[in-house]
Amino acid sequence: MANDAEDAVRSYLTSVKEDLMTGVSFMIPFVTIGGIFLALGYAVASLSNNVQDVFNSTGTAGWFLAQIGVAGLTLMVPVLGAYIAYAIADRPGLAPGFILSYIIQQGNVLQAAGDVIGLQGGSAGAGYLGAIVAGFLAGIVARWFKQRDVPEFIAPMMPVLLIPVATTAVLTPVMLFVLGVPISIANAGLTEFLSNMQGGGQAILLGGILGAMMAADMGGPINKVAYVFSVGLISEGVTAPMAAVMIAGMVPPIGLALSNFIAPQKYAAEMYENAKSGVLLGFSFITEGAIPYAAADPARVIPSVVAGSAVAGAASMALGVNMPAPHGGIFVVPLSNQPFMFIACILLGSIVTAVIATAIKPNFDAKMAAQSSDD
């Protein structure tokens, strides 16, 4: 009985994670377009020493590029909510998820809702936290409507008319007058807290935690929590955590490849070829490139990569490195406010990982002999 309950909980949590990651996967192209074009807009504006007034320079090349960037970053949050709902309820959940996520991003709407319920503080919008809540609720409610038995002549209207309208009607008052304003207050507090964490002890701690999470399971649920957290903050204009996460995610494959090159006797012969591809994967921000090493020797590899990524993430936050793009690795380094420091943090973390892994791993032959004697 206990095992059945445990399996049910595990299955539910897996489903929640998959639904969330569906939303994130559809959101990433919007973040990428938004972040890159906004950065290009600032870069072009800087050529005429007009970087601070890019949005007031109507009709200039920088202004047009920045408008594309703003469009991408504005739509990314509703898209997140829309595709979480889509993952749960398929097509009937898509429009309600988008509309509910969009409406709670409008600060004036939430401020008016706050006036109605006597709670102030919704002017900033509910951010990606609100979109996640709206997406899950829209998906759950739409799926409930979808599972109802209805007369045959009504069935064709259910997915395109009745379910989307009913779901939106049911959840709009909930999101505006119950959940929206408190989530907006929490989102504003989080954004302000992170915006003030530039170079201080709290920033270093946050960078270290995010870095360690990126390396802890190399693409697993812990890694994804850190990644989603940082991607969501891009729409709020907070891009330092994204830099820390990207840098930290690049460290494990590069650091372990470096260790393999320095001390090949500590690894199986076939791992040497894996190291070559690991460098490319690492610089492409594919943390999973370190998994073959972790699978072969988790007790030594995981502490090594966690330490290196934590150091890299902490250094990035301490130095105030920013990254407006959610993916791309070495190919988006020019978009950083400090590209050389971005690369330096990658190298620092990789060296820490390489030194620790090389120091604590025994020679491969000795390790195999010890395992044979244990058997």
Curated annotation (Swiss-Prot):
What is the first-listed, main subcellular location in coarse terms?
membrane
The membrane topology of this protein is: Multi-pass membrane protein
Keywords in alphabetical order: Cell membrane, Membrane, Phosphotransferase system, Sugar transport, Transmembrane, Transmembrane helix, Transport
Q: Which PROSITE patterns match?
A: PTS_EIIC_TYPE_2 (PS51104)
User: In what residue span(s) does the PTS EIIC type-2 domain sit?
Assistant: 16-370
According to its UniProt entry, the protein's GO biological process terms are: phosphoenolpyruvate-dependent sugar phosphotransferase system
Pfam families the UniProt entry points to: PTS_EIIC (PF02378)
The record lists the membrane-crossing segments as: 24-44, 68-88, 93-113, 122-142, 160-180, 203-223, 238-258, 279-299, 301-321, 340-360
**Which cellular component terms (GO) are annotated to the entry?**
plasma membrane
Which signals induce this protein?
Expression is highly up-regulated in presence of fructose.
Q: Name one GO molecular function term.
A: protein-N(PI)-phosphohistidine-sugar phosphotransferase activity
What happens biologically when this protein's gene is inactivated, per the record?
Cells lacking this gene are unable to grow on fructose. Growth on glucose is unaffected.
Q: Where in the cell is it found?
A: Cell membrane
Domain commentary: The EIIC type-2 domain forms the PTS system translocation channel and contains the specific substrate-binding site.
Other remarks on this protein: PTS-type transport systems are very rare in archaea.
Q: What does this protein do?
A: The phosphoenolpyruvate-dependent sugar phosphotransferase system (sugar PTS), a major carbohydrate active transport system, catalyzes the phosphorylation of incoming sugar substrates concomitantly with their translocation across the cell membrane. The enzyme II PtfABC PTS system is involved in fructose transport.
In Swiss-Prot or TrEMBL terms, this protein is called PTS system fructose-specific EIIC component
Record gene name: ptfC
